[in-house]
Amino acid sequence: MQTLSTPSTTATEFDTVIHRRPTRSVRVGDIWIGSRHPVVVQSMINEDTLDIDGSVAAIRRLHEIGCEIVRVTVPSLGHAKAVGDIKKKLQDTYRDVPLVADVHHNGMKIALEVAKHVDKVRINPGLYVFEKPDPNRQGYTPEEFERIGKQIRDTLEPLVTSLREQDKAMRIGVNHGSLAERMLFTYGDTPEGMVESALEFLRLCEEMDFRNLVISMKASRAPVMMAAYRLMAKRMDDLGMDYPLHLGVTEAGDGDYGRIKSTVGIGTLLAEGIGDTIRVSLTEAPENEIPVCYSILQALGLRKTMVEYVACPSCGRTLFNLEEVLHKVRAATNHLVGLDIAVMGCIVNGPGEMADADYGYVGKTPGTIALYRGRDEIKRVPEEQGVEELINLIKADGRWVEPEPIA
């Protein structure tokens, strides 16, 4: 079965193909973000950027398992300079990996330094020009808005100039928890405030003829995050803007719930055609984020990077230990990227429900299983020979490759 359906040109109400929102292409190193390219997987290392060797090792670990863009934190000028050493060591000992630098409080000098060394700079509009909260303030006048807007432009312009001259990119990364005080006074702690915060910086960048931009609207609550991205996409469409969106639920936590929370937010938006690059943020080792990203993309048919297994949940009709057999089949075949393999417990629903699979393993009678190629039954074999005979069938079709040896 081919889960990556050929895109159709006309969306229908019940279309099974995801029609991505058209967005421009933005280059980050050798990776392109935008609707004409696969949805990109990102993560962020935990290491202190001053630890050159540790950071290089962490970036390499992520990249080797499929992380296409890696973010590092740069809280000081010293950290920003260290990124140059990290980039060089990666190039000398491994390969050039697309890097993003995270810049926050009063970050102009830091951003200007790190822009020399990375492929994209992420700034937070709520913190880039920090407004110290005033407990006595009742609101902002138009004159104050204009003054702060000029201050933002003056602070942003050197970075925009640097990135534009180097043909590098910027992410305008809004966080729900760090909106500027004037946005909170004007729009409240709302998706509208998040969107206006991003649009303010977008307009400034466009005034400076800089459009290598990616936008994110992250929040720790999935409903807030989804509302912000939907509104951002609508506002950009209304304004004729086509910037790619970086999706993520920030501070999602760990374990099953962290994964579910991220999948709900990211997967829902992707299913609506919104989103061009994703990060699943877990309070775990960053390496644990990557399989979740690829699983979301595969489940939606947006990227196929693993075997697609179809298996029933088991019931009283099941003629063998379904869970055990599925594990055996997976262990033997999970390196055959691109295949769809079904493991079904009985003949009642098995053939119909697995009809789109490339190969099927179905309980036929007690102690006997049937092997299928597509919809066609090929042979019946004793259960104990089932996995071996499945492999032989795949080999006979010329679709088998030997697994890579474990290092």
UniProtKB/Swiss-Prot annotation:
Keywords: 4Fe-4S, Iron, Iron-sulfur, Isoprene biosynthesis, Metal-binding, Oxidoreductase. Gene3D superfamilies: Dihydropteroate synthase-like, Sulfite Reductase Hemoprotein, domain 1. Its EC number is 1.17.7.1. Its cofactor is [4Fe-4S] cluster. The keyword Transmembrane helix does not apply. GO terms for biological process: isopentenyl diphosphate biosynthetic process, methylerythritol 4-phosphate pathway; terpenoid biosynthetic process. It comes from the Bacteria. Coiled coil: none annotated. Binds 1 [4Fe-4S] cluster. It catalyses: (2E)-4-hydroxy-3-methylbut-2-enyl diphosphate + 2 oxidized [2Fe-2S]-[ferredoxin] + H2O = 2-C-methyl-D-erythritol 2,4-cyclic diphosphate + 2 reduced [2Fe-2S]-[ferredoxin] + H(+). Pathway: Isoprenoid biosynthesis; isopentenyl diphosphate biosynthesis via DXP pathway; isopentenyl diphosphate from 1-deoxy-D-xylulose 5-phosphate: step 5/6. One of its GO terms (molecular function) is iron ion binding. The keyword Transcription regulation does not apply. [4Fe-4S] cluster binds at residues 312, 315, 346, 353. InterPro entries: Dihydropteroate_synth-like_sf, IspG_bac, IspG_bac-typ, NO2/SO3_Rdtase_4Fe4S_sf. Converts 2C-methyl-D-erythritol 2,4-cyclodiphosphate (ME-2,4cPP) into 1-hydroxy-2-methyl-2-(E)-butenyl 4-diphosphate. NCBIfam families: ispG_gcpE, PRK00366.1. Belongs to the IspG family. This is 4-hydroxy-3-methylbut-2-en-1-yl diphosphate synthase (ferredoxin). The lineage of its organism: Bacteria, Bacillati, Cyanobacteriota, Cyanophyceae, Synechococcales.
